[in-house]
Amino acid sequence: MRVMAIDYGDQRIGIAVSDALCVLCGDAFTMQEWDMARAAKRIAGEVRARGVGTLVLGLPKNMDGSEGPRAELSREFAALLEAETGLKPVLWDERRSSVEAHAILHANGKKMKDHRKTVDAVAATLMLEGYLGTMK
């Protein structure tokens, strides 16, 4: 069963899915959706289509480890995902994932104006790699 990492945002959602052996990121993409319930339904469709057995959802934390309002939205989204998929998402500390994603895109020659299209997928990939690393 594959692992899917999700970087949830108000407008764009980064998604990364492992290979069948749960060793590497097999696919990463960005989904554009403004409605939380519709986003959960769309992701549930991807979960079924791709044979995902584990969900990893980014939990935004402040640098001191405390949780702010964005963390509450992620917890709400986690509940919707669980209702739609039957899988309880693993909440993954995503501190600095977007910063690292921007740095990776910049290092690969992407212009800042083009980051918006892919930064969420890269952030989800970083979370997936981190989670897969704990499975070894």
Residue ranges and their predicted role:
Residues 2-3, 10-136:
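Phosphate- and other anionic-substrate recognition elements at nucleic-acid/protein interfaces
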